[in-house]
């Protein structure tokens, strides 16, 4: 990989290391010192300090990981290219017109009759949020969460096992006990234990808050809330408690409005000014 060729370049690494190691005596300011030290540490963390044999082995592992991640993504995308067919418009009750039109267009593209809820988040989430047919909510939700886990040619379990094994090999080669230790080294938490401690502190209040939300949903639904019910009844609660409808917010998040807001905040916060170039002009 190109990144390995850069990281394993001994002359480049030694130059970066020399700058970082001598930062205190070379007159670098705090920002320059920080950049040099982080660059050196990143090179070391990715194998620059290994001997030739170690670099060769790490290169093999990194290539295998890259291939595994590509294969994983291809399998998930293949499952996302499937869809749930809805043959009756009654199955679309509750959906906004824009989502109905998108489902109809998806069906035409795939040469199927009716409407197609494609197995992607952009198609599934609106359906789970607005469609009234609970049986279809369950069907669409289960299909979505089972991407890459159907025991067929697109099943990812063996690929995941391969990735886990390769990550462990890489961690050991770089002097870490496991992938989590290697991954957390360059974070604020520093260690897996510290990260886990933070998550456990957040877990109890987060769980309590979700329980409150589910109780509100159950009060409206009149039955126990299942995973495929969550988005639908969250929207119902939002409407009942706050008189807030997602569809009423959409005009405010139209592309040009979002872009204008982004430019406005960039100017307010950072002093950046954006001006449209004449057609065909090139900025220098």
Walk through the language-model features, giving the residues of each.
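Noncatalytic, helix-rich "gating/capping" subdomain that lines the substrate-entry/channel surface
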Residues: 1-182
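Active-site-proximal, well-structured secondary-structure segments within enzyme catalytic domains
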Residues: 31, 35, 67, 74, ...
